[in-house]
Amino acid sequence: MTTPVRIGVQIQPQHSPEYSHMRDALRRAEDMGVDVAFNWDHFFPLYGDPDGAHYECWTMLGAWAEQTSRIEIGALVTCNSYRNPELLADMARTVDNISDGRLILGIGSGWKEKDYDEYGYDFGTAGSRLDDLAAALPRIRARLGKLNPAPTREIPILIGGQGEKKTLKLVAQHAHIWHGFVDPESYAHKSAVLAEHCAAVGRDPSEIQHSAGVELNGGVSRGEGVKELVAKADELHAAGITLFTVGVNGPDYDLSVAEELCRWRDSIA
């Protein structure tokens, strides 16, 4: 069965002192037909003023679950280091129930050193953080199976990252969705590596939805940028990617590129 194309928007919780701007962006995204609304799990802005306005991820997801009725929601992605695995499972189960089964549990090993230092977490090394994620994922899944009440569905796990030895192995073992930032050439290679990891664990690679972050080329006119973006989406879709996510930044949260992607999605349906 062919997986339908879906469009995501990452409503980045930065540079918007008033939460109402994010609430409005979420409303507009759902109204225009966006399929998934993501935020991210950081404590400070990733670009612009490093000490600018910023909000916490999972508290916001609870509010999103109440505000929306159709769109799926999640973090792109949760940092595994910031919460005990059992607690994260309970948080995910709770937001899943509040939203009537619309949560995607996006997770990764973490990378932003300032977040770790300012909030008192051990940054470790890239390898140790991936090892921690490998240890956490079975605990998360086990706790999801014990909670009362249970999740409303098997909560889809999205794993972000492209490392061939560890990250893609974890995707093969645990994920329903794999997210990366790829061009068509590197995607073909990474997808083949993921298929090898799936074969090693006896899993059909077609069970995993492939997701990519896309963005407008700021070095050309807007019209040309949209054409380039749609052409890239066409190429990535032909290669196997079916979830396309564009990020939007506060305080304006311009959703015009997401709207173009929704039109493209509908044109190929």
Task: Describe the residue ranges of each PLM region.
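Active-site-adjacent structural elements that line small-molecule/cofactor binding pockets in enzymes
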Residues: 1-269
